[in-house]
Amino acid sequence: MNDIKRLAGYIGSYKKDMMLGALMVMIETAFELVIPIMIADLIDVGVANHDLAYIYSKGFQMGICALLALVTGLLYARFAARASYGWGAKIREAEYAKVMQYSFSNLDHFDTSSLITRMTTDVTVLQNLINSGFRPVTRGPSLLILGIGLSFWMNPKLAIVFLVCTPVLGIVLFLIVRKVAPMYTKLQTIVDRLNHVVQEGVTAIRAVKAFVRGEYEEEKFDAVNTDLSVSSEQTFHYAVLNLPAFQVVMYSAIVLIMWFGGNMILSGSLKVGDLTGFLSYVMQVVNALMMIANVFLLLTRSLASAHRIAEVLDERIVLKSPENGVQKVKDGSVDFEQVSFKYHKDAKAYALSDVDLHIKAGQTIGVVGGTGAAKTTLVQLIPRLYDATCGTVRVGGVDVKAYDLHALRAAVGIILQKNELFSGTIRDNLKWGDPDADDEKIWHACRVACADEFLERFPDGLDTMLVQGGNNLSGGQKQRLCIARALLASAKILIFDDSTSAVDTATEKKIRKELAKLGDMTKIIIAQRISSVIHTDRIVILDDGKIHNIGTHEQLLKEDAIYQEIYASQMKGGNSDGIENEEC
């Protein structure tokens, strides 16, 4: 319940709608509770005395009450809808804002599909708590208390028979809720898995088609979908038991009331109209209990969803800007001082171990190594996407932990392995680097990245629309746009994380020549191809998370066995053209 209470704080400006909705429900309930009294009078006075005028009068009054109950019910629906959808929007905004603050290590705690489910399905479950649950939770107790009170007022003896059944219903409700609560949590977890499979399959649909793996993906989806179906069936198998259980108990009570009431009518101590009115109250109380039972089941599922949402909102941000953090990066120098790093504190092995590396401002550094050598891990410590486990990382001579995060990351441009572009125009995507960039600055960055070659062929140029992920561009085109976007940021340090792998060697050479003109910018190039780093001031060889050697291409080619092996394999593998061209 604490999670629900906490999320209730996001209702904010919609409290007025909630209060008005509750008022409408209470007025609606009052009108409905008056009707059984009118029915009793209509039978005992109007019908018994054959008084048509009285019957018409009471019938008209009952119609007015029913109409007013309908109007107040419709008004409630309007207020509840506004409150529930507004509340849901506020929660989604809070979740999304929180996720945008996450560091990479925070994101490691959640699957992307799970975060999507928590912002959509789980929020919808909470919205249903208001849409479907607020009315009965307000109306149910009112009907229950007033119904029992009025039934005692009409006939205390019959009311006692009915009242005895209430604890039995409470026990049934408790047992069902206790059984179903953990099943709802499991159900939402399977929804996460289903979303993950769908997202993965749709995102990689081109690879699925290329490798003719459609049947395999269908089988994988069917397996998870079947799990969801079975889990849903099991959950609702127990959840729906409340209806037959309640019906058995309550209809047994009604039979007893009719038996006792019939005997009382025969003895003359009870009128037919009073018994009819009493039974109307009994049915209203039964409905109230059913409403409360359904609300408890809805609340049970909502508690599971609220807990999942709270996990997102309560996730402790691992990386935060310090108070009064340094706002300006002096230069592009980078220093690693006895740096070690592991992704999880409980991990036995370090991804990086005892790294000592000093890069002067304006230098161009190449980083090579085998798969899993921790090349990407190394550079992710510079803009503080992760914090070093041991040791110190400095940028511009200052510990990265002392910087304001926004200031640090604005000074460090990083072009990731995966080229991320968004739906919208090419211009909009490039302006991520500099929102205020004019066309002249944008085109200059595109020329440096050799993106102007294909942009000039597009009829709409910078206004060309990109689909999600930029999938209407080739891999090389996307890489060049990502490079141009990073250049627009005018960062002091520019990191290329294997970000020219999709362009041909001739284009890569052009890009390097243009980048060489940016002498005041420190450039760190992670690459698989020797030709990508052969021109750099120094080359760092990483092996199993440790610095194996540092030197120029010529030095390493003479002295280092690992570098010689990489060079020889690429000469045999068809990269010799690029390497020879660089050495000419």
Regions found by a protein language model. Give the residues of each.
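ABC-type nucleotide-binding domain
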Residues: 327-584
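Short intracellular "coupling" helices and adjacent cytoplasmic loop segments at the cytosolic face
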Residues: 49-50, 85, 93-117, 121-123, ...
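Transmembrane helices of ABC transporter permease
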Residues: 13, 17-30, 41, 65, ...
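An intracellular "coupling" helix at the cytosolic face of ABC transporter transmembrane type-1 domains
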Residues: 13-16, 104-105, 121-130, 134, ...
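Helix-loop-helix
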Residues: 50-57, 146, 150-164, 234-308, ...
